[in-house]
């Protein structure tokens, strides 16, 4: 169950190199996960919204790195447990920790309070007025 209100962004196909699509996105006719898909060109072809790829730095012939990429990740997308799990487990995979992911998946509970903001750009003043620091979210 992966759904977010962000758009399904178009990406250049085919994906480069050894990229492997993990999840395809579908444009829906509304803003609810239960809305039907849009017919026609918008979903043909379906666009990848999450994929993996390896890379190799120059001079590092014996080592390959792993990348997990997604076009999702707005603050509203994180309301979906499926989106949170996709991203967290994708990061575990990229770090070589996939064997530590249990069969039922990792817990990805939201650390309260969580108040996502709508899409848009914020002024510097907005962030100063919020006066939020990472330590404010430390769990007891």
Residue ranges of each PLM-predicted region?
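Catalytic beta-strand/loop cores that center a nucleophilic Ser/Cys/Thr
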Residues: 1-62
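Active-site-proximal beta-strand/loop segments in catalytic clefts of secreted hydrolases
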Residues: 24-27, 70-74
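Active-site rim elements
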Residues: 37-41, 73-81
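Surface-exposed substrate-engagement region within the catalytic domains
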Residues: 43-46, 77, 88
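A short pocket-lining beta-strand/turn micro-motif at the edge of beta-sheets
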Residues: 47, 63-68, 76
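Long alpha-helical segments found as membrane-embedded helices
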Residues: 63-67, 98-140
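Cell-envelope and extracellular/periplasmic
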Residues: 72-73, 95-98
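Short amphipathic C-terminal alpha-helix that caps PH/PH-like domains
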Residues: 83-94
């Amino acid at each position: 169950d992966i759904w977010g209100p962000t758009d399904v962004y178009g990406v250049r196909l085919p994906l480069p190199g050894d990229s492997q699509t993990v999840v395809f996105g579908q444009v829906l006719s509304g803003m609810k996960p239960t809305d039907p898909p849009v017919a026609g060109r918008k979903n043909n072809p379906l666009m990848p919204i999450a994929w993996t790829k390896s890379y190799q730095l120059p001079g590092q012939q014996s080592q390959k790195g792993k990348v997990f990429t997604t076009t999702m990740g707005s603050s509203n997308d994180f309301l979906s447990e499926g989106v949170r799990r996709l991203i967290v487990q994708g990061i575990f995979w990229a770090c070589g920790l996939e064997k530590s992911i249990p069969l039922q998946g990792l817990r990805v509970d939201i650390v309260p309070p969580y108040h996502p903001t709508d899409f848009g750009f914020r002024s510097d003043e907005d962030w100063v007025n919020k006066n939020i620091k990472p330590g404010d979210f430390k769990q007891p």
